[in-house]
């Protein structure tokens, strides 16, 4: 079974905002997240991930509606648990919602959502969005308690935060095996609880193959590295290269197909 690839196009909007933050609607505003979504599909993406943050640092609300209208790929809408974002989600009606933590100080999402500690605040949001027909994912650290709380709250999916794993691989430190073990245990627990297990954050062309050691993964959500690679080879080719690196995964072995 091939892993599904969700392509996060937020940082296409980041590049646009670097020049057109005050004029995102200008005819000159580029690059276009809509073009990126179209190229992602041509490159083999299975879904498109977008995150409209409260501070609108990259994706704008208008982008979300236009992207959804322009592509027939399912939209995975990342959002903080705020009434503003709930209202946007109810208007946008994406196929998937991924609830994430969000602070203005962070450069990007730096850790998993504390479903255990925020259970009572998150539960009504999950219920509201599911009632409107959306499939819910929780972006969580690979922690057994967070997986169990996500299943208890009724989320159909979890996305395992792979940032610590990615840092350990890049820095060639001894914690690499420990981080993979955390991911393995979290994936097994999610599978046992009947929750779809996805993963994302910090995954790149150099480390993606190491996630073959983690069983029961369904989809990887990858963004920044694809946008960075696209500067050299174009967006469609960057997606296709990542797609090729994700072939041959065996979810039951947690390793390369044998």
Task: Give each language-model segment a name.
Residues 83-92, 143-153, 199, 203-217:
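Catalytic cores of alpha/beta
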Residues 98-106, 157-170, 216-235:
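Glycine-rich phosphate-binding active-site loops on the catalytic face of alpha/beta enzymes
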Residues 68, 170-176, 229-254:
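C-terminal helical cap(s) of enzyme catalytic domains, especially alpha/beta-barrels
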Residues 3-9, 48-50, 75-79, 97-99, ...:
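Hydrophobic faces of well-ordered beta-strands that scaffold small-molecule active sites
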Residues 44-46, 70-73, 91-97, 131, ...:
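Glycine-enriched alpha-helix->loop->beta-strand junction motifs that scaffold or abut catalytic
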Residues 49-128, 145-146, 160-168, 183-189:
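N-terminal active-site wall of soluble small-molecule enzyme domains
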Residues 1-77, 88-94, 175-178:
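Conserved N-terminal beta1-alpha1 strand-loop-helix module at the mouth
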Residues 135-189, 193:
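Histidine/lysine/aspartate-rich catalytic loop segments that bind and position anionic ligands
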């Amino acid at each position: 079974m091939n892993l599904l690839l969700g392509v996060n196009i937020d940082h296409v909007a980041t590049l646009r905002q670097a020049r057109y933050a005050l004029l995102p609607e200008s005819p000159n505003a580029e690059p276009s997240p809509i073009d990126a979504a179209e190229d992602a599909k041509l490159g083999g993406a299975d879904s498109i991930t977008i995150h409209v943050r409260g501070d609108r640092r990259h994706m704008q609300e208008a982008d979300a509606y236009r992207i959804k209208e322009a592509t027939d790929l399912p939209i995975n809408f990342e959002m903080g648990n705020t009434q503003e974002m709930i209202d946007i989600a109810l208007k946008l009606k994406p196929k998937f919602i991924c609830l994430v933590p969000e602070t203005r100080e962070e450069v990007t999402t730096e850790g998993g959502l504390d479903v255990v500690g925020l259970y009572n605040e998150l539960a009504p949001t999950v219920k509201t969005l599911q009632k409107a027909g959306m499939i819910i994912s929780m972006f969580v650290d690979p922690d057994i308690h967070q997986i169990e709380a996500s299943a208890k709250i009724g989320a159909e999916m979890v996305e395992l935060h792979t940032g610590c794993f990615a840092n350990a691989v890049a820095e060639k430190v001894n914690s690499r095996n420990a981080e993979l073990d955390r991911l393995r245990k979290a994936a097994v627990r999610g599978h046992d609880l009947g929750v779809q297990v996805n993963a994302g954050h910090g995954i790149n062309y150099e480390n993606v193959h190491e996630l073959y050691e983690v069983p029961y993964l369904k989809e990887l959500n990858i963004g920044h590295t694809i946008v960075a690679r696209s500067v050299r080879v174009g967006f469609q080719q960057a997606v296709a290269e990542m797609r090729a690196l994700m072939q041959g995964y065996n979810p039951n072995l947690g390793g390369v197909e044998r």
